Amino acid sequence: TYPANYQASQIIHAFSFSNPHIGFNLTIAGLTFLFGYLEYMYSFALVIKERSAPYPIWMHTFYFAHDSTGVVVFAIAAMQNHNFWLFWGASGALVVWNLFEVFNLYKAIYLERDAIWGSMYKDGHVPLKDAWLRVITQLCVMIGVVNLFRVFMNDPYMFKWFIFTNILMAIAPGMYWERRQTQVGASRGLAIVIILGTINSFI
């Protein structure tokens, strides 16, 4: 059965160096972060080379909201648990992810705004200030959604959310590529990385 709740002590035990399974746990955690970073490296490459990101704009705003919340949650957890190394490490890693998301949001606003929102305008051109307003509005909504569902899911340290974000990554980009009907901004290599990352999430 899926655990209805979990505590910081369980995480600390799993990632304490006295745990005989620490090697396995670190390997899986390391692979999880590696796949996550690779998914964004592909996004960087595609948006720079093809001027089109592989993920829809709402995924960027959602992941920014999720990861910025995680930065705060893990930093607080570290301070409440004798500066346990994993909590500080996770908080720092999520800061890096936030920087990735800022880059993607910047490119969405300055390079992709017509492709993203152009259908809403008669001439297909999206004013820069409108793009900024849409992104900021989405960010506010997503931050609210992430924190509201943390309460609903009884998810004090974001680990249930992490599983959901990996499932979302496995589903949403493929649907987005299919709707766009083009390989521009998509990649077979990225699809393979997403599949492997999703499998790793459930090991």
How should each PLM-predicted stretch be described?
Residues 1-203:
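Alpha-helical membrane-protein topology signature
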